């Protein structure tokens, strides 16, 4: 397994970091990323492939972030930046997939404009193919795989610097989860839902809390089902608002990218539709 490739052999005592429940959870997560990366290479056309890989990386980053204060910052930062860069490689591909899914759902409203073989969908599929080809070059050259191995090595180094045994980790985890919950609830009260940055940031925090509550359950001895359920609800509600905003701006960028006046018109019309739907959701929220 590539996960073990960069494992250090240096003698390290007391080595609390590597033999803990937390370390085994992180190593499982690393194995999950390897599986998702292999699955993407098997079927890059399937929208779920890139999405699953990004989610696996996001989960790992949330779990590393959870112990940020308890290990060496240098390795934490290195691992975090590496993993973020890898996830970002698949970011535009994911945005295109979300947008195409939305277009297919809107086909009832605009049957001609959004026909599968029509101008809009053809343009989007060609754009996606181009992006997929760019990613394929990174894979074929070995650059992306090397980046993943570097990220794994930094993650392993970070684990070695965490000097908490399981009992200490349990205590720290309970404390941190409480703190995260309080902070999130405070932010929820203060958030301006019409502000994309604030909404997006709150959604990320809800995901972090959900992932931590889910995957750190072995440390706590049980799953905090209420928190997980609550955060899933927050995430879903904010997700639609965020997607509509991203889609709207993406469509405007596409209108600027093409010289075809018909396509420009279609993209702008669809963009307007996304922003109007977002507005309607915000008005519902206000009522």
Predicted feature locations:
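Function-determining surface determinants
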Residues: 1-287
């Amino acid at each position: 397994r590539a996960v073990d490739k960069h494992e250090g052999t240096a003698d390290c005592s007391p080595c609390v970091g590597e033999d803990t429940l937390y370390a085994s959870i992180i190593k499982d997560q690393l194995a999950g990323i390897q599986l998702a990366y292999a699955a993407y290479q098997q079927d890059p056309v399937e929208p779920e492939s890139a999405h699953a890989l990004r989610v696996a990386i996001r989960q790992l980053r949330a779990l590393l972030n959870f112990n940020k204060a308890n290990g060496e910052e240098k390795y934490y930062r290195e691992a975090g930046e590496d993993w973020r860069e890898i996830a970002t490689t698949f970011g535009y591909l994911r945005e295109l997939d979300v947008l195409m899914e939305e277009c297919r759902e809107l086909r009832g409203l605009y049957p001609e404009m959004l026909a599968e073989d029509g101008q809009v969908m053809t343009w989007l599929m060609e754009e996606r193919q181009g992006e997929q080809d760019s990613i394929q070059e990174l894979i074929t050259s070995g650059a992306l795989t090397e980046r993943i191995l570097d990220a794994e090595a930094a993650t392993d180094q970070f684990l070695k610097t965490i000097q908490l045994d399981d009992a200490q980790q349990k205590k720290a985890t309970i404390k941190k989860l409480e703190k995260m919950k309080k902070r999130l609830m405070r932010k929820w009260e203060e958030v301006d839902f019409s502000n994309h940055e604030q909404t997006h940031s709150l959604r990320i925090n809800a995901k972090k809390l959900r992932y931590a509550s889910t995957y750190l359950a072995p440390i706590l001895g049980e799953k905090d089902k209420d928190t997980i359920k609550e955060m899933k609800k927050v995430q879903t509600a904010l997700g639609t608002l965020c997607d509509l905003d991203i889609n709207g701006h993406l469509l405007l960028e596409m209108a600027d990218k093409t010289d075809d006046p018909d396509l420009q018109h279609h993209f702008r019309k669809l963009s307007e539709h996304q922003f109007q739907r977002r507005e309607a959701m915000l008005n519902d929220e206000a009522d």
